Amino acid sequence: MRRYLALAAVMVMAMTACSRAESTSPIRSLGASFDPRSITFTAILTPFDACDAVLAHFKAEALERVGPYGLDGGPRWYFFEGGARAQEDTAGPPGDGSVTTMAAGLPTGGEDGGFSGTNVQVSGVDEPDIIKTDGERILSIVDGKLRYVDVTGDEPVLLGELQLETGWNHRFFVDGDRAFVFSQGDLDAIPMFAADSRIAPPYGMTVSVVQEVDLSDPDDMQVVRTLRVDGSYLSARSIDGVVRMVVSSYPSNLPFVYPSNESAEDIALAANRQIIEASTLETWVPSYTLYDADGDEVTSGLVVACDRMHRPAEFAGFDTLSVTTLDLSGSLGAGNGTGVIARGETVYASHTSLYVATNVWIPENVSDTPDFQEFSERYETAVHKFDIAGDGPATYRASGSIDGHLLNQFSLDEFDGDLRIAVTEGAPWSFEEDSESKIVVLTERDGVLVEIGSVGNMGKGERIYSVRFLGETAYVVTFRQVDPLYVVDLSDPESPVVSGELKIPGYSSYLHPLGDGLLLGVGQAADSQGRTTGAKATLFDVSDPSDPRELSSWTIADAYSDVEWEHLAFLYWAPADIVVLPIQSWMTQFMGAVVLKTDDGLREYGRITHQREDRPGDGSDCEVLDSVKEAGLVIQLCDEGDDGGYGGYYCEPLPADEAAALARDWGVEVSDDQLDAADRVEVCWPNYELGDPQIMRSLVIGDTLWTLSWHGLQANALDGLEVLHKVEF
């Protein structure tokens, strides 16, 4: 806890320096920020030789940039002609990539093939998720509770549940009778702050939390150790029981003061410089604390040892990106960390390398009133490479950057030692007419990721919606009005080429190999103007790279699937030729999963819902206009004695003209003879709190399909989808 005591001392010093000279807002901690124009992305990073050098580096850079409002006081905004505006940077979701070949498809089964595994990007590189199985038990985390369900008998049995630490985004790995749960929390959960309400945690500071859970007694699962690391948890990967956890940290415990008027700025600047001068190593470098089962501190220290910290030759910000190594086969410890002074957002790992990428805006020499194109052109992607071969600590290897922004984890892939990156030029929200997408191939040379090949001119005026790298081939989907699927030949990394292209309406935001030259896309259908109309799954024949074809498709109007942004929600079970997609429709109120068959094209095999026992049934004693109900909205005419209301819907009485206008907004025309000004009219729309719970994941054990929702687990027969069992949470 030394870090927080030092923080309190610095705050007292700052208050003493400024209390008589100026009026300030309440002293509070803000995330350190700075003028992004001063950032230079230098590819070669060098390690520090001592802790004094680390502290001196941070102090010198901060003293050069601190002002009366702290370190630049926040992001810089620009206003463009036409009213568009943009923030300084945009984060992409964390994730991974794939080196699977099309011929094999993507394995998702357990070691014996009798159950499905997590839908990972790289076979053998596990990813944490909210559900895991070994074929005999199903472990899941829903609403912060870890549940253990035994599925070895005739009936599934919920043996135990454990309330986890307050936080969010709980995901876990399992190794034998132990689970390692990763989550994002805040400092309220740390004993020092929880025990004394007078001590407020630093404003905006978050912690990454790892909890080791003993599963040996399912009736009495216990958290035996907890590791807390300063910063935001990005992602983790596990290879042969060795976990690499990636965290991005920033110095958010600098209690800068702020002047109440212009005349006090000099005094505030002096106070803020004093705060930086008084800062310690723990102020800048993230710390960890390890607790035992009773919440007592076991050990604490810096996440990254000083000689394992790396910095660029020129200023690159105050963030620390750390990769911590944990061993699943032993008790949870502090781990061995490696770090670079840089930001991190998107994580990808092969069996031997881990990459962390960041979308960054570099606004050097931007005019005071830039146009949109000038702003968009300044987006870059910075990438840092770490060696994770073996079970030792990760080793920093190289860095590099390219123009443009990447979409997510699938934009990165390592093959034969080279890194392939798919990016779109410009800002993530931009649809510039001359923008294009490209694939760039980087290789490591003397600590630098250098470009050795590229292919562009994909999707003019569009941006990437999905990418899948499969061996020497990449599949790229761009979209604005139509969905071009590009097939890219990467067999020659120095001279990649686009070998084929297919244009169809809509887009795929997730691509999955099915083997035998088949590729499945999940996304949205769209009309000729690019307006999305509902969820869509498309089966592509890509056996001829020069002539990709759409074999068949399946759609559901006014709906979406979590698979569009969460690949872990996807299930492909090759032994039964099925794909399972969670589906939510905002018009028909369908909440469940759709099972598609892939053995002869693409066809719907059935639907699964976790039907609630207390769900109100459809129906009303009023006259329902069926034509409106089909669009997801119910408009009904009620007599004076009618109770009104519609089961499972929220109803509100409206004047006839307003009801008709609302119906038109939903795409339904109501004729004059259907509504009269004197009528009592009720407008009803789906109340999802009363509907079926959303299905989040699915898995297969033997001949049973299991699905997970907030409400519990449900077992359906693979053959026919008959409901077999339910385990309610």
Can you annotate each of these PLM segments?
Residues 2-19:
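Secretory targeting and sorting signals
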